């Protein structure tokens, strides 16, 4: 589909616009003339008239459908009305939805078909297949009035406001074109009928009002065009007529009930304006209500009604009384529920009327529910009488009873007897044509039956078909059969040229270039010239009208076949219902299975996700643990490096101090050597004493050196380091119980280092231990409670190390028993003080013993001084172990082999260093003694 744009002055084609797939039934142009909206049944499109290009397109669901889309006058708003009674307002530029009108009250809800808007765009009038008019206030966006037209108005076909130059666009007069062809103009405020145009005899098909409201152009049902002068129609309307509508109550602003909106119709008479004798315009003012006239004359009617009176009744009421529609009220027959699939008719209204008519025929007689060609037979009559289904039904019923006699005797086969009549007549009048049919195996079922079952609707135009049936209905029923023969005889030339069966089929199913008047004349000729023995009128009954009140019974068909088919159809229908029920059950079961499968799949997926999440979390935890272990390893490595560096620094400081002392000693020795050289001659006898004195002084210097070194660098530092190590071990044991084993090893290393230091530095540590005994006692006393609580954990750790301590278990048990005995004998600080005094005494004795051993046996016992010190250290250790310290025993006893090995290695290193120093001192002494002896011998020789 495409739209053409024409220039009104030059009448030339400007452009055409493509885009619609179905016919366009509405065009609305914007007040500026820049935009236009075209509407079809499935879409509405917005066009730019400057470029003739499509800007936007409104698509909707097929189940809804568009009723109308148009611009509001003097506004930039687009109003869209759909078939579900929804009305939306859109902004033209942005196409933003401004608002939606609410649904009308259910009690007065109608399907809107036609719309009209005042020139100021404030009031929207809507109507449809009802005698109600809805007036919407677009500013308040609510329904403010319902106008009820007279009862003779059954449907509203067109609405249009009458413009007025003095109402500022708020039009008050609304033109309403109803189904009876009369256009009534009413005042929407006073609800009075002003005037009307058209009549029942000369109905209006469509109408339009000039922009200034001076003229009304109407196309009549007979095709004529009438132009009315509004001024002439309203010259006596100033005398107000009695209202047709009684105002019950205007709508309050806060209510929307249909009872408050509705204005009810009352009977009345409108004064008719005087007609001008010169005027030939056929207009009528509203006469008294036809309802009252017909009701008053109802009992005065004779036994029958003529055609003119029936037409008056039909135009006045729009339908016949209800008692004649009993067949229609039975609903759609089951045989025609899917009629649209076999006969896809574009017009839904026509399809609906055809379906209802066929259903009425099927309800009338069972045979028609199984007649396959019934839709083809009834379709032309349905299309002709689509606005009155009762007439359509009765015409078809009359046709079947009279012109379709004996058609159903051979059901479900074609009427062979009727076709034989046609063939006999054709054989009599045109033997050559019949012989041509016989030669090409063309039977009457091909050249006669297609024309009968479609009643010539496929081969004739509308006008030709109407002309033909005017003659058929006006003659004997045999006239229809003669028409078939006449049609073949008039078409003998093209038929004689056909040689293929497909050509014959095409010919009898399509229109041909044939004059229907010639055919009709030929039919009349055949009716007159056909012999009586083969004439169909001798075998067909004369015309019989339908009975009054109820329709006649139609049973001219093989009842057993129809009953059998009906039973089979019912059986098949029941089987289909059973099958559908079973299929529905299976589908329900399948749906449940699918749902269960989906739920199971979802559950499995959820479990899989949970498992993956758990694995991810576990991997993350493992990674974190690995990182923590690596960090701990790095921290331990850093600690080891720091300790090694500390030891190296201590060793370097000690070496520097020793070197300084050695240098000082060498300087002193050189000074002594010089002094001895000067006095050698004077003190020969004092050489031995001087040598001893020098040795003693050397020992004193060595002891002073060690004391100074220990006092300055290690005494306080060792004690502070010991206390810090103990405090750190205590805090680490409390905060990180899971790392007790590593901390225990560190505590063991610290204790081992302290033990080694005590072994190597007995003298200095003894003095400092006397000063810090109380401090250690207090710290150990605080740790006692926690040590008791963690004793259980230590025992569990001890189980893992018992295999490494099998050789020490007897010593540990003895120490534990000794500790238990001493714990019971004394408590608290007294035992600690006694232990401290004992340790001090042992330290003094050890110091005296050490000095004595160094002086008397420096050379003989220098190689294994540690063997002499070990018993003393063990005694001191036993004394110190008597303190109330359970953790000390456990720490010293629960060291692993690696810790013991590291302690032994350090002890060996300390022993090696001590031996080296002692060896160096011994060599120095030997050298000094040798020098002294050499000088002494030289002096004796000189003296001699």
Swiss-Prot record:
Top-rank taxon, per record: Eukaryota
Where in this protein does the record put region Disordered?
Answer: 262-281, 865-900
Q: Which gene encodes it?
A: TBC1D31
Instruction: Spell out the Basic and acidic residues composition-biased ranges.
Output: 865-875
Q: Write out the ranges of the repeats annotated as WD.
A: 12-52, 53-95, 96-143, 144-191, 192-229
A GO CC annotation given for this chain: cytoplasm
Q: Which positions fall inside the Rab-GAP TBC domain? A: 300-476
Supply the PROSITE patterns for this chain. Answer: TBC_RABGAP, WD_REPEATS_1, WD_REPEATS_REGION
Write the protein's name: TBC1 domain family member 31
Assembly information from the UniProt record: Interacts with PJA2; the interaction is direct and recruits PJA2 to centrosomes. Interacts with OFD1; regulates its activity in cilium assembly. Interacts with PRKACA.
GO biological process: any one?
cilium assembly
